[in-house]
Every structure is written in C-alpha cells, then in structure tokens.
C-alpha cells in the first residue's frame, strides 16, 4: 500500500490491486475521487483541477 499527502489531499493506492491501476484521493476523511490511472478518468466521484494536476505530478515523479 502506498499513502502520500500532498496539497491537502491524501492519495492511497495498493500494489497488485485489481485492474485498472487506480488511486483513491481523500480530503478531510472523505473520498474525493477514485481515479483510473490507465484510462485517465474517474471511476467514482469527480476530480477537481488541483487533484488532476497533483496526480500528473505524482505520475511524472514515478510515485503512482
């Protein structure tokens, strides 16, 4: 399991979890979005622009 806090959001992912590769994003203990990393679209919830920017940053850093 990976867990990272950035920009006021908590990003949680599991290695070997079911496909597609995805990340859960929380703020204040509530799920903001479950984001499909392979297809670049929400699986649940909606992703505000700051979350999309942070996901792109984390992917470019090799963290997701």
Question: Which role fits each region the language model picked out?
Answer:
Residues 1-21, 25-64:
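Metal-centered catalytic cores of metalloenzymes
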């Amino acid at each position: 399991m990976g867990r990272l806090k950035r920009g006021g959001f908590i990003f949680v992912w599991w290695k070997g979890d079911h496909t597609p590769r995805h990340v859960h994003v929380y703020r204040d203990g509530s799920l903001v979005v479950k984001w499909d990393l392979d297809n670049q679209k929400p699986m649940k919830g909606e992703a505000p622009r700051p979350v999309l920017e942070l996901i792109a940053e984390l992917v470019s850093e090799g963290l997701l």
